[in-house]
Amino acid sequence: MSGIESTFFDIGTMDAISRQDTFVHRLDPRIKVLTALVFIVCVVSFGKHDISALLPFLVYPLFLVVVGDVPLAYLLRKVMLAAPFAILIGIFNPLLDREVLLYVGPLGISGGWISFFSILLRFMMTVGVALILVATTGYHAVCMALEKMGVPQVFVVQLLFLHRYLFVLVDEASRMVRARSLRSFQGKGLSMRVFGSMAGHLLLRTMDRAQRIHQAMLCRGFDGNLRPFHPLKVRAWEVLFLLGWSAFFLLMRFYNVPRFLGTLMQGFIS
């Protein structure tokens, strides 16, 4: 039970972090969403062998972590939870692309390894920025920003319900695991048959509880429309935040600054 609640479904911490009062938290949600979108588009548009050109993009997530007071250890744990998906995508690249593209002293590095590390780096940056966006904005505020930016309301409401009902699923799963632990000998005897039965009961119990929650929402006047906690208003300095970072991302995208600096240093040394 503790593993379910604290290791994999530790989503309540995000909401707690989002209630802080920092410069990043005070930014309009739409500004943060647009800046994150520009960042993600620029990062994923690089070629498979580009690594040095990606490094300057680390400035933005590090800026958000420091200024937004986001716990770095917590963020890295959440990124690592999804890391196996990126590893599975690029794990066979070193076997498929064996042409040596880079030498580090006597050690030759093939294009497959370079592309593999490029996939991991892009994954960590994009997922990290998405998590920081939620941690410094709040899930409800992100959904409100999407709705104000023209995303279909049906889709936004589904995202909100997914977030809310995930807590319901975790609560029901915790109850079932606790009940099973109390009725078994040190948690033994979890066969596939028992696991399948528990999964089926979990689905039925979650659907039943979600239906009761929906009925309660209708009784309280829910009509499918999202209502912000406070009005959204973009200020001039927030527009400068968006334009400044977007200009930085585009500059780093079209100019390989680390390579230019390396060439410049070699010229001075020689």
List the model feature ranges, each with a label.
Residues 33-34, 54-58, 76-79, 83, ...:
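Hydrophobic alpha-helical transmembrane segments
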Residues 78-185:
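Juxtamembrane/interface alpha-helical elements of multi-pass membrane proteins
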Residues 1-49, 56-66, 171-270:
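Transmembrane alpha-helix interface motif
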